[in-house]
Amino acid sequence: MNKDMCVACDDGILNIRVGAIIMKDGKILMVGNDRDYLYSVGGRVKFGETAEEAVVREVFEETGVQMEIDRLGFVHENYFYGDAPSNRNKLIYEISLIFYMKVPDAFAPVSESFMEGSSKEHLVWVSLDEDIPMYPQFFKTELKNPTNMIKHFTTDERSPSAPRSAGRQRPSR
């Protein structure tokens, strides 16, 4: 079995991740656990997988539903400090490719919860206007008016003076 594209480096951890944008009735499907924030459906790319294969696999693992990709929406470079027991306070540089998914009309997750390693996670439908912390944070603004552009965002939480989020875009191909 191929391993997750997660590499321990001298100064931190490098993650290659995919995320899925699953929108229905003006809400987005997000994942939560015992922390006080939500994050996108998705996970790490496995060595030997393409990002497209990884996002389809992750969506199926987390929802039990096979979905097709609509298009690549975002490239997100993210520097942050880990908060899980395995990476607590370690600097993580994560590169995420985030895809809009084609959501079937009758879509409903097979289960509202699933196990990720040893932690239990749950799926939540959230309005972008709800006052709930979610990551990536740019979802709250960018998903209200989606475009056919591939947008690139960089989030840097290494220090209070570091730029929090910056973005640029280019046409989707």
Question: Predicted segments — roles?
Answer:
Residues 12-14, 87-95, 115-120:
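A generic structural micro-feature
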Residues 134-173:
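Charged phosphate-binding loop/patch that engages nucleotide di/tri-phosphates or the phosphate backbone
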Residues 1-19, 25, 89:
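Acidic, metal-coordinating catalytic segment for phosphate/diphosphate chemistry
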Residues 24-62:
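Conserved Nudix-box catalytic region and its N-terminal flanking loop in Nudix hydrolases
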Residues 80-110:
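Active-site-adjacent beta-strand/loop module that shapes the phosphate/pyrophosphate-binding cleft
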Residues 66-75:
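A short coil-to-beta-strand element that immediately follows conserved catalytic motifs
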Residues 100, 110-146:
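NUDIX/MutT-family hydrolases
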Residues 22-23, 30, 101, 125:
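Conserved hydrophobic "DFG−1" position in protein kinase catalytic cores
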